[in-house]
């Protein structure tokens, strides 16, 4: 059928089926209107609208913020910026010396109280969690930041992933989040006030080949946050899963910032200024998820709008294969120098 015949058939359908034509016009208009509305909503949330004021969760009212993985990268920035906002800060991490120095810096800069607790989440047993729970038991926790996390040493196929590495990733990314949240949640429920931030990853929203265990644990955080958020909504507690692309940190192994890869301070500022707003995660079908940093938000919304997850998975697979090749070559060069 040539182009002329197709056009002639289309015109005849419009002429002979006015109701069908009207229906198609209405449906097309609704579809276009919905995309315009959703896009404007995402832009407003990401660039203009303010999030929930932190005073709702006890800032400058004597409440504490608990931060895991609090001495480096994103966790350190959460500790500093929550202190600046008026929270006392309870820092949880493995290295006692870094805990002490970070706590001293916070007290000197912001004049708030601090407390520290050393725990290795990769090896934590029931006794270790009971000890942490006991330390947190009398604390008026307004904010919990489940930030501690671990990824693979380098991208690798699941069949080649060391068992110890798999176990550590699950212990740190999943078990630590469950246990610490379970320790502070009863107090939040009793006080009818609280904010729980679970630091996630795009690897949980879009499966990441060669980081299968890490990707699976981050997907867990997405579902856990949605379920818990619905449970405690009646108690005036906000649960937010932070969908995060790359940030300059030891975990990401990225040292240079860019428009798509912010430094920790810029990333945390975006999170704390957009509490309660899904931003780029709007219309993603992931309740209680927020993608607040502007470039991450646009990327997340773009994936939702265009629906190219399968292409993104393939791209990520290729990227991780290249990263692994370069990492192995570097290991070979280093071995020759020894």
UniProtKB/Swiss-Prot annotation:
Catalysed transformations (reactions): a very-long-chain (3R)-3-hydroxyacyl-CoA + NADP(+) = a very-long-chain 3-oxoacyl-CoA + NADPH + H(+)
The keyword Coiled coil belongs to this UniProt entry's keyword annotation: no
Molecular functions per Gene Ontology: ketoreductase activity; very-long-chain 3-oxoacyl-CoA reductase activity
Active site: 214 (proton donor), 218 (lowers pka of active site tyr)
SUPFAM superfamilies: NAD(P)-binding Rossmann-fold domains
Topology relative to the membrane: Single-pass membrane protein
Compartment annotation: Endoplasmic reticulum membrane
UniProt EC number: 1.1.1.330
Transmembrane segments: 20-40
GO terms for biological process, alphabetical: fatty acid elongation
One Gene Ontology cellular component annotation held by this UniProt entry: endoplasmic reticulum membrane
InterPro entries in the cross-refs: 3_ketoreductase_fungal, NAD(P)-bd_dom_sf, Sc_DH/Rdtase_CS, SDR_fam
One Pfam family of this chain: adh_short
Domain of life, source organism: Eukaryota
Alphabetized UniProt keyword annotations: Endoplasmic reticulum, Fatty acid biosynthesis, Fatty acid metabolism, Lipid biosynthesis, Lipid metabolism, Membrane, NADP, Oxidoreductase, Transmembrane, Transmembrane helix
Primary location group: endoplasmic reticulum
Positions of NADP(+) binding: 66, 95, 120, 147, 214, 218, 247, 249
Leader peptide range in chain numbering: none
Pathway info: Lipid metabolism; fatty acid biosynthesis
Family: Belongs to the short-chain dehydrogenases/reductases (SDR) family.
Annotated PANTHER family: HYDROXYSTEROID DEHYDROGENASE-LIKE PROTEIN 1, VERY-LONG-CHAIN 3-OXOOACYL-COA REDUCTASE
Purpose of the protein: Component of the microsomal membrane bound fatty acid elongation system, which produces the 26-carbon very long-chain fatty acids (VLCFA) from palmitate. Catalyzes the reduction of the 3-ketoacyl-CoA intermediate that is formed in each cycle of fatty acid elongation. VLCFAs serve as precursors for ceramide and sphingolipids.
HAMAP family: 3_ketoreductase
Protein name as it appears in the record: Very-long-chain 3-oxoacyl-CoA reductase
Organism: Laccaria bicolor (strain S238N-H82 / ATCC MYA-4686) (Bicoloured deceiver)
